[in-house]
Amino acid sequence: MSSIDPRAIIDPSARLADDVVVGPWSIVGPDVEIGEGTVIGPHVVLKGPTVIGKHNRIYQFSSVGEDTPDLKYKGEPTRLVIGDHNTIREGVTIHRGTVQDRSETTIGDHNLIMAYAHIGHDSVIGNHCILVNNTALAGHVWVDDWAILSGYTLVHQFCRIGAHSFSGMGTAIGKDVPAYVTVFGNPAEARSMNFEGMRRRGFSAEAIAALRKAYKLVYRQGLTVEQALTELAESAAQFPEVAVFRDSIQASTRGITR
């Protein structure tokens, strides 16, 4: 049975699963759908069209599904889709998409979005990502699975953050970050790979060693990107993890952080 505080405001068109909890002074607007087991804290504003999946928790003073401030936005119908088992901490802001891109901002499953983080319009967050306090993503940013963005990380629009990558505190990212790579600084520079994260997630010693060699080829041998990718072909055929690293470089449209 749902638990809706009498001080909350729920639009009649909103669709809430039977056991959803909504705290006092929260506002659930039109065209908002909330899945089972989700808890909405006090002083949260949800604006639609927004779909929120199962077993999420959204903490106080978050604004989820608001219009984008992009000056191209003229009120067209766009939406926000949030998956399952996400934690959205205090004061987070997440904007819906624009018709000039995907018309949708998307957040996957099992993500931790910490206090005062911002996710801009048309961004895509994968699964098992962590956005630490005050991280800010401009519009059209992609964050692949298991990426960790430390506090005060800033990401320029249209950048892609690769799977299992890691940014240090206060990093300003203006180019794509390949999978597994650790970046730090303003502007961001590649420092190493997220080997500790790989070990925690069960990567084999052989795969980690292969990725270490791959990183040195791209970043330490003085090769052009094209030359390094050619050198990676044999290792990528043997190790899927190296193939992911190579593919994330090949897919870059902004150039990679070096």
UniProtKB/Swiss-Prot annotation:
The reaction(s) catalysed by this protein are:
a (3R)-hydroxyacyl-[ACP] + UDP-N-acetyl-alpha-D-glucosamine = a UDP-3-O-[(3R)-3-hydroxyacyl]-N-acetyl-alpha-D-glucosamine + holo-[ACP]
Query: Subcellular location, in the record's words?
Result: Cytoplasm
What is this protein identified as? Acyl-[acyl-carrier-protein]--UDP-N-acetylglucosamine O-acyltransferase
Sorted keywords for this record are: Acyltransferase, Cytoplasm, Lipid A biosynthesis, Lipid biosynthesis, Lipid metabolism, Repeat, Transferase
Gene Ontology BP term (one): lipid A biosynthetic process
Subunit structure, interactors included = Homotrimer.
According to its UniProt record, the EC number is: 2.3.1.129
As one GO molecular function, the record gives: acyl-[acyl-carrier-protein]-UDP-N-acetylglucosamine O-acyltransferase activity
Q: Name one Pfam family in it.
A: Hexapep
What is the role of this chain?
Answer: Involved in the biosynthesis of lipid A, a phosphorylated glycolipid that anchors the lipopolysaccharide to the outer membrane of the cell.
Give the pathway annotation: Glycolipid biosynthesis; lipid IV(A) biosynthesis; lipid IV(A) from (3R)-3-hydroxytetradecanoyl-[acyl-carrier-protein] and UDP-N-acetyl-alpha-D-glucosamine: step 1/6
Cited PROSITE patterns:
HEXAPEP_TRANSFERASES
| Source organism (scientific name) | Ectopseudomonas mendocina (strain ymp) (Pseudomonas mendocina)
Q: Which GO terms describe its cellular component?
A: cytoplasm; membrane
Family recorded in the similarity comment: Belongs to the transferase hexapeptide repeat family. LpxA subfamily.
